[in-house]
Amino acid sequence: MKSFADKSMPTILMSAILILAMAFLFGCSEDDVTEPAVPDDTTDDTDFEATDWTTETHSKDADPNFDEVFEDHTVKRIDFVITAERWQTMLDDMTELYGEFGTGGGQPSSFDEDPVFVPAEVFYDGIEWYRVGLRFKGNSSLVSTWQRGILKLSFKLDFDEFEDTYPQIENQRFYGFKKLSLKNNFDDQSMLREKVAGDVFRDSGLAGSHTAFYTLYVDHGEGPVYFGVYTMVEEVDDTVLETQFDDDDGNLYKPDGVGASLVEGTFTEGVFVKKSNEDDSDWSDILDLFDALHDDTRTTDAASWRTSLDAVFDTEVFLEYLAVNTVIQNWDTYGLMTHNYYLYNDPDTGKLTWINWDNNEALQEGKQGGSLALDFADLDSGQWPLIEYLYADEVYRARYDAFLAEVIDGPFDTGTIQATYAAYESLIEPYATSEIAGHTFLNGSGDFQMAISELNQHASERASAVDSYLD
C-alpha cells in the first residue's frame, strides 16, 4: 500500500486549484453576497475507485478489530486530508455557531445544533478511507477551545455518513467501526485522563468505551499539520452495545438537560434524546424509572420500593458506577451536571442500565466547587434523587460501600494506577511535549510532567480518603 503522502486525489486537487484561480482572476466586489459554503456544491469528486478497500479494513462484514484500533501500549498516527474549501466550511460553521475564533466570550445558552459534517479522506497505516464524514464535536469543551484560539478540536468520524453521495463507500467501516470519536484531551495537560478513567470503569466490569492514544495530522490544503495527542474513543451507539450486551436492539438514550437530573416532574422527551429506535415515539421505560424512583413507598416501605425500582433500573450497575466515579472523581457528571451518561434499556433484563461517558475531567478534585464527597454530604438536596435516595437507603448504601472497597483495592489500587501512569507517561511524552503552539493546551513541556505528578498525588489521596470513609 502507498502511504497517504504518496497517494493522489487528482479530481479534488484540480478542482480546488481551479476554484482558487477563478477567485483570484475575477475577485469580488463589496456588493457581492457570499453564500454559506455547502459541501460538494463546487467539488465534483464522485468519480473515484476505492482501491484500498478490503473486507478486513473497510467492510461492514468484518467484526470490530479492537486489537488494531484500541491498542493500549502504542501511540498510533491518523491523518485527515480535507480540501481547503471544506475546511473553510467547517470553520465558517463554527463561527456561525460560537462566534469568531479566538475572541473569547461565554457559553451559548444551548447546544441544540451539531457542527456540520464534511467529506474527508482518512489515512492510517498506509491505507485510505474515502469521503469519511468528519465534524467537530463537543459542547462546552468545544466552545472553550474555539474561543481560546486553539485548533486542537475534538472530531467525530462517521465512515459512511456520505454513502448516498458516494455509492462506492456504502457501509464503509474502519476495521469494523462505523463511528469513532477523536477527543482532544481538553484542559488535560497529562493527556491521560480520558483513557485511564475509561479503563478503570471497564476494569471494574462496567460497560463502557474502549480508548487509545493517537497523534493526529490534518492537511487542509497546505500539507500535514500536527494537531497533537488525541484519545480515540469507542462510540456507545455503535460497537459498545453491539459487543458488550447480548441484545443491542433496546432503547438507548443520551440525556442532556434539566430532566436528566431525574427530579420528579422534570421529564421531557427532548431531554432524553434517543440514539436508537428513533422512530419509535415511546419513552415509557424512562417514565417507569421516574415513577419507581419517586414512589411514596420509598419512605413507607423501603423493601417494596427497592423491588419496584430494581424491576426497571439496574441499581447494581449504577451503584458500582457511582462508587468508581466518586473514588476517581469527576465533577462533570451526574450529581453536579445534567449530562455525560447514557441509559440503555437492555432487552435481556428489561432494565435501564447506566453507561458512563466523557472522562476528560476525571481524576482530579475538579472545577465549580469540585467533585462530590464519598458520603455525598455536599450533594444539593432534592436535585439529584438517584444518588440521594439510594445512598439514604441502608441496603443500597451497603452495596455502594462494598463497591468502594473493590475499586480502591482493585482497578484504582494506588500502586497499580501509579504504575499505569508511569507507563503511559513514557509512552506519550515525546508526542505530548512536541505539540505546537495553537494546537496544544500546554504552555511548555514542564506542564506535562507537573500534570503526571498531580495524578500520582491524587491517587494516594483518594486511597486515604476511601480508607477514612470506610473506617
Regions found by a protein language model. Give the residues of each.
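Bacterial N-terminal signal peptides that target proteins for export
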Residues: 2-16
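Bacterial N-terminal signal peptides
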Residues: 14-24
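Bacterial Sec-dependent N-terminal signal peptides
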Residues: 23-61
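Hydrophobic alpha-helical membrane-insertion signals
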Residues: 52-140
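Middle-to-C-terminal accessory/interaction subdomains
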Residues: 56-58, 67-69, 73-77, 86-90, ...
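Short, solvent-exposed loop/turn elements at domain surfaces
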Residues: 86-93, 130-132, 141-144, 165-168, ...
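Internal "kinase-insert"/substrate-recognition segments embedded within catalytic cores
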Residues: 152-165, 173-185, 191, 204-209, ...
